Structure formats: C-alpha cells, structure tokens
Regions:
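Short glycine-rich or small-residue beta-strand-to-loop segments that form or flank ligand, phosphate
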Residues: 189-191
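Active-site-adjacent loop and "lid" segments of alpha/beta metabolic enzymes
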Residues: 1-6, 13, 30-44, 63-88, ...
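Enzymes and membrane/adaptor proteins characterized by extended Gly/Ser/Thr/Asp/Glu-rich
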Residues: 26-28
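Phosphate/pyrophosphate-binding loops at sites that engage ATP/ADP/AMP, CoA/4′-phosphopantetheine
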Residues: 49-50, 54, 89, 170-183
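Catalytic domains of carbohydrate-active enzymes, especially glycoside hydrolases
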Residues: 43-59, 253
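Glycine-rich, aromatic-flanked loop segments that form ligand/cofactor-binding clefts
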Residues: 16-19
Length: 279
C-alpha cells in the first residue's frame, strides 16, 4: 500500500492533489473514460501518473444520473484485477475504490487499495466497521436520493447548511466508532441531486461544508452536466474548459483533492497558476 497520509492534504504550494478517474464500466457518462481491460487501464493509468496524478480512483459501477445499480459480484469482478495490477505497477500512488458497498470495499482493500470513496456516505451499515478495522481513509459524499432518481426536481432551503448537516451526521457516526478525523474527507456531491444553482453555491462555499477542521475536502466536477446548464455544452467531450475554470478556484476554496478525467490539463493549470503567483 502507498503512504496515503501526505496525499490526503493539499500540496505544499496550496493546490489540490489530483485524482485520476478510472471507470471500469460500460455506461459511465463520459464515454472516453470507459475502460474494459487491464491492458487498456494500465496504459491510461500510466499516462495519468506520468502527468502528475497523486491518486487513481477505480470504480466498477456507474453513478451517472439515471444509472442502474449492478450487483456486488459483478462490481468485484470488474475492479479486483484492475486494482491488483495498479498496485503492482504503482506502489507509491494512492488508489481509491469508488463503491457504495462494504463487501466491494473490503475486497479492494485486500487487493491493495488505500482509500474508500463512498458516494452514498455510509448507506451500507457495514462500511463503518470496515473503515474502523482497516484504519483506512474514507471519502463521504452528499447525495440526495439514488443515481436513478437523484435529479428528479431536487429542492433545498439552504443547500450549504443542509449538505453540511448531513455530512456532520455521517462524520459523527465515524468519529463515534473511533475513526480519526484526518482519515475522513468530505465531498459536496456536485451534480448528485443538485441543480446548477445548488452546485454553484456549494462550490463557492468551499470548505465551509466541512464540519471538522482536521477533515479534508474533495471536489468532483470534471465534465459534469452542470456545464451543459452553465455553458450550453451538451457533449461531455466539450466540457474540459468549464472543468478547468472551476478547478482554478480550488486553491482559494481549500480543496485537498480534485477528482478529474484530464490529469495533464489540470496539472498544467496548477503549475501555471503557481508560477504566476511567484511574480
């Protein structure tokens, strides 16, 4: 396993760690990110690592709006050989497993994954005990509803305070079980049961949604449908500029990890911004 501790917080220059997305699914919302073989995944992952990825996030179930769930056996079948191959090739790179199921997370951790990226924020009651026992980090994300129905007219009074309240409840469950705050990272869940106005408010709030000082903040905005509403970009392949525009805010919002499809472009952005700050 990698030494994930320094990878949970921002870089020394204040910019976030970069997490590259590896979708081992046939139906993820961004077609170019769909991977189906170990060889293809290793090729893409190698490019990501060479371009500066700190983390590789492996998912075997699509969570795009309207996506149907797959069973745990199929999810494990998809991700296990990939994680094994990634761990062998990249011993020092952080590997996270994107799953809602404790049984899948456990199998991934056994194979060498370092962190659990749980978009359902502990919907599986066995997840808490797993995280406590393994003493591994976890990302908990806010989502209103399920992927198949989350975008059906989501409503909030004050989206920032409501998201923080839910995350606080989940964090308290973990803390009560003995999980250390620095093992926990929160994600506002951009595009998961939110309209454009909700997404913008949450991005603007930055780390204000995080209930504990020692916790981290992760953003996942890469090529999401909010750029269709914001910029009129209906095709996912046309949303890179919008993704980079949001990423440029990450340092000022104290983001620790940013989850992206386009590692090289985000690393170049942060390098350019860091260089300009020195003048």
């Amino acid at each position: 396993m990698a030494d994930w501790r320094p990878l949970m917080v921002r870089r020394d220059d204040g910019f976030p760690r970069i997490m590259g997305v590896l979708n081992i699914t046939p139906d993820s919302f961004y077609a170019d990110s769909r991977l189906s073989s170990i060889e293809e995944t290793l090729k893409i992952a190698t490019t990501m690592v060479e371009n500066g990825a700190d983390w590789l996030d492996v998912g075997g179930e699509s969570t795009r709006p309207g996506a149907k769930a797959v069973d745990s056996d199929e999810e494990i079948k998809r991700i296990l050989p990939i994680i094994s191959a990634l761990r062998n090739k990249f011993p020092d790179v952080g590997i996270s497993i994107d799953t809602r199921r404790a049984i899948v997370a456990e199998a991934a951790l056994d194979e060498g994954a370092d962190m659990v990226n749980d978009i359902s924020a502990l919907s599986d009651p066995k997840m808490v005990e797993l995280i406590k026992t393994r003493d591994c980090p976890i990302c908990i994300m806010h989502m209103r509803g399920l992927p198949e129905n989350m975008q059906h007219n989501p409503e909030y009074g004050d989206v920032v305070s409501e998201v923080k309240k839910i995350l606080s409840q989940k964090v308290n469950i973990l803390i009560s079980a003995g999980v250390k705050p620095e093992r926990i990272i929160g994600d506002p869940g951009i595009g998961f049961g939110k309209l454009l106005e909700h997404n913008i408010k949450l991005l603007s709030a930055g780390k204000k949604i995080i209930p504990l000082e020692k916790m981290g903040l992760m953003w996942g905005v890469s090529r999401k449908s909010m750029f269709s509403d914001l910029l009129g970009r209906k095709k996912t392949e046309d949303r890179l500029a919008g993704s980079l525009g949001i990423a440029a805010m990450a340092k000022s919002r104290a983001v620790d990890i940013i989850r992206v499809h386009d590692v090289a472009e985000h690393r170049d952005l942060f390098r350019a911004m860091s260089t300009l700050e020195d003048f």
